[in-house]
């Protein structure tokens, strides 16, 4: 949504392995845009200059490296990768292919500060003025208001269920170990499972 509203960018393509999500992405833009099921097709699109990777983190490293190989710059959601090794490979790829990589920690720039109701711009101005001195230590302790049990707590046992027709579950899993489908593994609640993310700290800690 942010890319649609920002005058400095033009959204030319969307990609998702969930047909319903893909359709929602297409509807965000008034003009006709390309829609892809496979990210490898999107990064070969000559109309694409920058890719915004907003998948679960277990895909971040692979997609970033492949996008760099295809000559695209990358805007990637946090965390950069699930592991340090994956992160190092991404850094190597950026140097090897001469591409730019930007980690999206947009809570630092959003106004008001997401979840806290605190304006960002006055705080940024205060820090930049030097009035607080340097080095500066900031301790974040207030909960953001997210339902942490819903978003960040996995379950020990999940009853296997049928994969919905709109979701390519095998592609969604990608490099992760195979586990039978359950809706709690995908979309909003995937963060509670180490195969895909690292819970609340890995999800939210990097914003601050």
PLM regions with names:
Residues 1-76, 85-101:
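N-terminal glycine-/serine-/threonine-rich beta1-alpha1-beta2 phosphate-ribose binding loop
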Residues 13-15, 52, 136-139, 173:
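Residues embedded in well-ordered beta-strands within globular domains across many folds
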Residues 22, 59, 75, 88, ...:
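Tryptophan-centric aromatic hotspots in well-structured domains and transmembrane helices
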Residues 53, 79, 105, 201, ...:
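Glycine- and other small-residue-rich loops at beta-strand/loop junctions that grip anionic moieties
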Residues 55-58, 81-85, 111-114, 184, ...:
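Alpha-helix capping and helix-loop boundary segments enriched in small/acidic/polar residues
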Residues 73, 81-166:
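A contiguous active-site-proximal alpha/beta segment in oxidoreductase catalytic domains
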Residues 160-208:
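Glycine-rich, aromatic-lined ligand/substrate-binding cores of catalytic
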């Amino acid at each position: 949504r942010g890319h649609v509203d920002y005058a400095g960018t033009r959204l030319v393509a969307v990609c998702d392995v969930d047909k319903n999500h893909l359709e929602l992405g297409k509807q965000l833009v008034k003009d006709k845009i390309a829609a892809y099921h496979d990210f490898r097709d999107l990064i070969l699109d000559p109309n694409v200059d920058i890719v915004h990777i907003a998948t679960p983190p277990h895909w971040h490293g692979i997609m970033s490296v492949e996008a760099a190989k295809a000559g695209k710059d990358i805007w990637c959601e946090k965390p950069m990768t699930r592991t340090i090794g994956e992160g190092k490979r991404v850094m190597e790829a950026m140097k090897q292919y001469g591409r730019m990589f930007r980690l999206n920690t947009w809570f630092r720039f959003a106004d008001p500060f997401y979840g806290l109701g605190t304006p960002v711009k006055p705080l940024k101005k205060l820090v930049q003025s030097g009035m607080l001195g340097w080095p500066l230590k900031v301790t974040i302790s207030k909960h953001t208001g997210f339902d942490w049990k819903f978003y960040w707590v996995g379950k020990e046992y999940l009853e296997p269920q049928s994969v919905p027709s709109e979701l390519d579950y095998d592609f969604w899993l990608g490099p992760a170990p195979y586990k039978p489908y359950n809706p709690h593994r995908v979309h909003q609640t995937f963060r509670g499972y180490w195969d895909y993310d690292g819970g609340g700290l890995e999800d939210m800690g990097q914003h601050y």
